[in-house]
């Protein structure tokens, strides 16, 4: 089953390049919708191959059993995505990308089952949510240039919290189930934000989104990546998945170096380090 993990990483390299750099530079809504459309397509496959009534009943049961945990997981993941996009607009990519790859550390933390982190993560998540809301409001009344580091740190912390939260959910459900539910929840938040905009602003946002042909290609990549990742996680250890996630990040960094030559001159050294780290983890 290692072939599925490898295939997942190769596919994610291509999709991450465009999602993180192209869609992120177009508009944050474009990035979120691209992931949500992929989740919707995966849900379509699940409905096609399973009993729809039983499938949606299992969704409802899972969410109703632990609603607070689901809410915190989705909100921290959403804050992480938002913080990443805001930091891309305010800081050079050679600063943003290395810091946001710190979320790989949380995979290691979860692998060694540091339960004290998961036990206290609910209170931390609530506290982080309040801080995140404060920064969102504050950004409307202060200079954009001063907030770049704020958003990047918020992104790293949010993703760091979202991962152990999501791991505790994945323990009782399949990875594909979880990925679909979480992405669908995120697009609901994006839709509510879009509805809250006035008519002219909404038209301006929608006019910046990529073409349907581009979306079709991007969503196909995401679906293939998530399906391969879900199959791989059923039989591959978390430490091996960390290694392949490292390879995926390396691809994003190296290809990003060629697309943004003038802005990422030193990134290949980080890529080389991550390559060695990933190889060590695979062999270990």
Could you say what each language-model-derived stretch is?
Residues 1-91, 118, 138-151, 184-235, ...:
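Membrane-interface interhelical linkers
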Residues 9-10, 74, 101-102, 157, ...:
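Short hydrophobic/small-residue motifs within alpha-helical transmembrane segments
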Residues 15-20, 81-85, 96, 104-107, ...:
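Interfacial helix-capping/hinge residues at the ends of transmembrane alpha-helices
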Residues 31-32, 96, 178-179, 241:
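Juxtamembrane helix-start motifs in multi-pass secondary transporters
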Residues 38-42, 99-114, 185-189, 225-226, ...:
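Alpha-helical transmembrane segments of compact multi-pass small-molecule transporters, enriched
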Residues 43, 102, 119-138, 267-284:
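Hydrophobic transmembrane alpha-helices of multi-pass small-molecule transport proteins
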Residues 43-54, 107-121, 158-176, 221-235, ...:
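Hydrophobic alpha-helical transmembrane segments in multi-pass integral membrane proteins
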Residues 84, 103-124, 134, 193, ...:
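C-terminal transmembrane-helix exit sites in multi-pass transporters
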């Amino acid at each position: 089953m290692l072939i599925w993990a490898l295939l997942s990483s190769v596919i994610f390299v291509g999709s991450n390049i465009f999602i993180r750099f192209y869609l992120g530079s177009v508009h944050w809504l474009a990035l979120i919708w691209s992931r949500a459309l992929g989740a919707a397509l995966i849900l379509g496959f699940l409905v096609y191959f399973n009993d729809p009534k039983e499938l949606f009943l299992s969704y409802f049961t899972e969410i109703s059993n632990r609603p607070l945990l689901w809410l915190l997981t989705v909100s921290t993941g959403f804050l992480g995505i938002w913080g990443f996009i805001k930091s891309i607009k305010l800081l050079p990519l050679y600063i943003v990308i290395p810091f946001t790859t710190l979320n790989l550390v949380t995979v290691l933390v979860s692998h060694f089952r540091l339960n004290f982190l998961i036990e206290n993560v609910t209170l931390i998540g609530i506290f982080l949510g309040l801080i995140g809301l404060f920064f969102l409001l504050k950004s409307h009344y202060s200079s954009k240039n001063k907030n770049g580091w704020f958003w990047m740190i918020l992104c790293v912390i949010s993703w760091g919290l979202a991962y152990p939260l999501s791991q505790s959910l994945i323990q009782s459900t399949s990875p594909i189930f979880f990925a679909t539910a979480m992405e669908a929840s995120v697009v609901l938040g994006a839709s509510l934000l879009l509805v809250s905009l006035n008519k002219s602003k909404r038209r301006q946002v929608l006019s910046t989104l990529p073409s349907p042909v581009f979306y079709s290609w991007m969503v196909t990549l995401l679906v293939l990546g998530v399906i391969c990742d879900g199959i791989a996680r059923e039989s591959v250890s978390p430490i091996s998945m960390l290694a392949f996630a490292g390879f995926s990040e390396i691809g994003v960094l190296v290809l990003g170096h060629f697309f943004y030559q003038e802005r990422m001159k030193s990134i290949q050294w980080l890529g080389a380090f991550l390559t060695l780290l990933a190889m060590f983890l695979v062999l270990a």
